[in-house]
């Protein structure tokens, strides 16, 4: 599993500037400036998952000005990128054996419930295997 430090190092290696902001969205990707901003004061788990999502946008070359269906497609891709890198199939299986609830699985994995849901959707849809080949 990636850590905040790993993700920050990856972002920097991609030429992305990291900064913070107060209030508003948890995270922002600004493609023209090649910058990621994370809201100050986030819980460490939310910080990790938000940063992973935004680094996904950067890695995938997303257009931060996209709207409509194109933006939705980019959001889904960034969610999947983050989930694939934060949760392995082995870690997920172990967490699910220990905890019957979605929130318990998320807690065990050290990620948000939203990230577990993104991982589950990717696994159910069969896209998880494609991400394994692309990793």
Where in the sequence are the language-model features?
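Active-site hotspot residues in diverse enzymes, especially metal/ion-binding acidic/histidine motifs
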Residues: 1-135
